[in-house]
Amino acid sequence: WGGAPSPIEAAMMAANMAPGRNRSFTAEEWPHIIGKKVWYDAMDEAEEMIDLSVETDIQGYDIDEDMVKIARENARMAGVDKLIHFQRRGVEDLHHPKKYGFIITNPPYGERLQDKSQMPQLYRTIGERFRELDSWSMYLITAYEQAEKDIGRKADKNRKIYNRMPKTYYYQFLGPKPPKRRDV
């Protein structure tokens, strides 16, 4: 996942963190449009809304230990490292005890994979692991043209996107909706 943007963004959403909270904006320098007090009051309000005590089950995996270290550091810098469990793990070891959940993945493809002959087997393994999580959904970004074929299932939705290269796809493999929780 190249530094774990998906798990980090999920943790930030779970903790009610405003996107871009640690960066500056050109609009801050436009006091004639947005007064400084209004700007800083909004920033203070956004900080007060953060809840790092939220319980999460967000996990990030990569087979490359260096990428896991980078992901942990990125999560620490974003302030959500306590909300994510990172682990060195290959897709062949993907399993989870929960009945419902979802996978967000951007597996290697094309230039990101040293040996392109490994792609069919990688995507078959993704499909096998996903089938075992039969109540889960999977959201997959790839430029690999044979993804659906090798996964062994046609995506419920397929969108073309641009991920620094043409013909990148966002596949949505939808599982059943979990039952609604009842307030106790």
Regions found by a protein language model. Name each.
Residues 1-95, 111-112, 118:
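Conserved S-adenosyl-L-methionine
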Residues 90-93, 97-184:
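C-terminal catalytic and target-recognition region of SAM-dependent MTase-like enzymes
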